[in-house]
Amino acid sequence: MCDQRPNLLGSLVLLGFFIFFVNGEECSNSSSLIGHESEFKMLQHQLRGVFTVVDDCSFRVSRFDMLSGSEVHWWGAMSSDFDNMTNDGFVISDQKLNQTFKNSSFIVRLLGNVTWDKLGVVSVWDLPTASDFGHVLLSNATESDTSKAESPPSESNDVAPGKSNNSEPFKAPTMFDNCKKLSDKYRLRWSLNAEKGYVDIGLEATTGLLNYMAFGWAKPNSTSNLMLNADVVVTGIREDGFPFADDFYITESSVCSVKEGTATGVCPDTVYEEADSVGSSVNNTKLVYGHRIDGVSFVRYRRPLNDSDNKFDFPVNSTESLTVIWALGVIKPPDVINPYYLPVNHGGVESENFGHFSLNLSDHVDECLGPLDADNKYDQDVIIADAHAPLVVTAGPSVHYPNPPNPSKVLYINKKEAPVLKVERGVPVKFSIEAGHDVSFYITSDFLGGNASLRNRTETIYAGGQETHGVLSSPSELVWAPNRNTPDQLYYHSIFQEKMGWKVQVVDGGLSDMYNNSVNLDDQQVKFFWTIVGDSISIAARGEKKSGYLAIGFGSEMTNSYAYIGWFDRNGTGHVNTYWIDGESASAVHPTTENMTYVRCKSEEGIITLEFTRPLKPSCSHRDRPECKNMIDPTTPLKVIWAMGAKWTDGQLTERNMHSVTSQRPVRVMLTRGSAEADQDLRPVLGVHGFMMFLAWGILLPGGILSARYLKHIKGDGWFKIHMYLQCSGLAIVFLGLLFAVAELNGFSFSSTHVKFGFTAIVLACAQPVNAWLRPAKPAQGELISSKRLIWEYSHSIVGQSAVVVGVVALFTGMKHLGERNGTENVDGLNLALGLWVFLCVVTVAYLEYRERGRRRARNLSRGNWVLGNVEEDDSIDLIDSRGGFRDKDDEDRNGGRMEIQLEPLK
């Protein structure tokens, strides 16, 4: 029998030669991009790697990390802008990337109809969500201006976004030469440039948004308590999504504090030195890049090896093994006391939350296998809708849109960029559309929006459409009530543009269904719910932003208020604690024991909700306890304030527990009416008070004085009656206006400048009737005026005029007080009008005084030609007559009548 093995071997050789020949013919090396190398720009799914063009039909991917997706492909387009990537992009390879990659390397072949001259961008693309996980730019493409930017652009030549080419490949800020695993959730990356004298360090951790990542060098030759006198850099992501990296120096294991000009604790270098030329030189850490993606915080910064700051920074020998320290913990945001992000004690277990090791920067280390995978990958803001508060929909620039690529303009709800919107079944949701007439808002089942029929896809529209568009001056209202058949996941978008909105989560009924009333507290950052049943009240409060604790208080301000604080311990157990606060320091926060039932505290993606039920009037055996005075009267407006912070405890409170954000003013909650108003808004009753005071001090009382000064020439006692009527009417209106203000404010405090001037003016005005009743008698005809009468006349005039002057000043201080409460934009016009009125009054008085002096001169001239029996001559004089006294009604009776003289013939 013949042996067939030689023939089989020959066939295999021919087949291999044929495959090699065919491949060689298809994969030529004519493209100018051959050999082009670039690093992937990370946008989502922790994508990292190096891209290299091999030949005309393939490319190599090395050191490739990526979290898995649903239907991920290699994608191509001419540029990285939204329209090109979304509408003109296409699949360039048969390979699918649906699994997780861990430091992988492989060759990718292009489809037969794809050539390099058709590509400017190669992307890792998820088809169902039109998501760009990351991409590289080829030499004929530039980065789109609308691409996601998580930090200011780097000035480094080694890490520079933008155009890439063969001679200067793109260096991604997320790529490093070395990586060390510090814990399961924390990694250290670095790239050394010893020639230029610096090291680039990247800190990466699956940690909370308000947490810090710290790394630095321990004090040389230190063997114990390595944190003390260490030179560290504290990094993290701010609340607005942008990174920070600051030099810190540790003098004590405590939060930074400055007392009597001396800084102690974990403080920035700049705190130890004044912020001058010296202060600016001590912070030599340079932030290069930072982002927060998929629940992973990443910050890259540059540190010089030999720092000019020898006081707080240690020199680093790149070839020597030195002790370094690291930590993870909660960050304390800036507040009214300090302007820095300060780390709080990390706590936890060594090697998980903190640790130390020996590091030689020159050693090559690669301990990081695959990307970090966070349990909670979504940090987007959450808006929880209810039936009583409309959701304001506007359009604004894209800063942190969660699903790149995206258009340059996206939707905002209640001033938050593309938040996740949570609605409850059975609860109507009201939208106020103010995004412009080119943005038609709608709720759809399609992930991308923008009218799915244009992409040959079907969608179900649940609310809105082409007609739901509006502007600020003329908003369009849309009411949508999800029902039990509404799917759990929907999307809000513009019908004319894809990917402007984000997700709508539909859940079963919650707080809005459980409580009869709800209002937004100051700045719309906390929602307050309540239901009154019998002699008890059930209360709930929900924050609208992520925080470590949520506090609400009953009172005008935190001082002298009763506080309810919802927080979580280290085990994740929620608590609601009660306190009486009688000062501004931590020692002024006193725990109380209130009779609360149905207490709950929960957190959903960092949004805290607290609930409890308490009696309206506490039943106390010891009435001297503070909580016994914490009574709620449903018929009286309840003043409610709020605060949020990073960390709370039921133990000894310190400055680290201070709130990071708080209400600016209390809100008056009308418990029986189910409504609320800002405590400092101009109330109608106070508006009436202001008008009445202007009528009295600006018109009636000055008019009474002018009548006594310039109407003496009227025959009879007409001027006196006008004077009396105006003064009495003005004084009556002053008292009515005062009663209105006292009743509305439940009394008044003399701490206000307005109250001081107003009360002084009222006292002076009240002295005038008493002064008039005590006036001395007029001297007889021909007699000299007495000293008592003269003193009375002067005092009556001076007190009256002083009262009007002080009253006008009180009007202006009232306007200033109104501006402090409501903002200057509401008061500037009123101040201008009041000033104009005072100016016109001054001009009028000047004119009347000029006329009076002219009339007086004419009268004096006519007296030399006095005709006997001329009854038409008016001999009335000024307020002060020739005898130095004031003329009153008695003078008019005596001098205003006809004089009879009997003439007898001379003999």
Curated annotation (Swiss-Prot):
UniProt-annotated location(s): Membrane
Domain DM13: 31-139
Membrane-spanning ranges: 685-705, 730-750, 754-774, 795-815, 829-849
Signal sequence segment: 1-24
Binding site for heme b 2: 723, 796
Cytochrome b561 domain: residues covered: 653-850
Binding annotation for heme b 1: 689, 754
Domain DOMON, residue spans: 184-329, 524-645
Record remark: domains: DOMON domain could bind catecholamines and thereby could regulate the cytochrome b561 domain function. DOMON domain could bind one heme b.
Name of protein: Cytochrome b561, DM13 and DOMON domain-containing protein At5g54830
Source species of the chain: Arabidopsis thaliana
Lineage: Eukaryota, Viridiplantae, Streptophyta, Embryophyta, Tracheophyta
